[in-house]
Amino acid sequence: MSKSLVERRLTEVGERLKELRAELLLADEQLRHLADTADDARLRAMVSETPLAEREHRDAQRHADAMMRHQAQVRSDVERLERTQDELLDRLIAER
C-alpha cells in the first residue's frame, strides 16, 4: 500500500473514530438515564403490583437493554478501528 493511501486511510479512520467516540459518550449518557428510568419503573411495579406498572417496567427495561447493546456495538467498533489505526501506523513506519 502506498504511503499516500495509508495516510488517507489513517485520516478516514481517525475521523470515524472521533465520530464513534462522540456517539459512545452520548450512548453512555442515554444508558444511564434509561437504566435509572427502568430501575424506577421496577420499584413502582414492585410497590403497586399492577399489570400496567409491570408493563411499564418491561418497556423501560427493554429500552435500557437495547441501548446497552448499542453501546456495546459502538465500543466494539471503536476497538476495531483503533486496531486498524495501529496497523496503518505500523505500515507507515515500516515504509520509511
Task: Please name every model-derived segment.
Residues 3, 24-31, 75:
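Amphipathic, non-membrane alpha-helical segments in soluble helical-bundle scaffolds
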Residues 47-70:
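Short, glycine/alanine-rich amphipathic alpha-helical segment
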Residues 11, 29-33, 54-62, 78-84:
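Short, charged, amphipathic alpha-helical segments
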Residues 20-24, 63-84:
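Amphipathic alpha-helical coiled-coil segments
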Residues 11-22, 26-29:
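N-terminal acidic leader/helix
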Residues 27-48, 52:
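Extended alpha-helical coiled-coil "stalk/arm" regions
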Residues 1-17, 89-96:
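Short, charge-rich amphipathic alpha-helices with coiled-coil/heptad character
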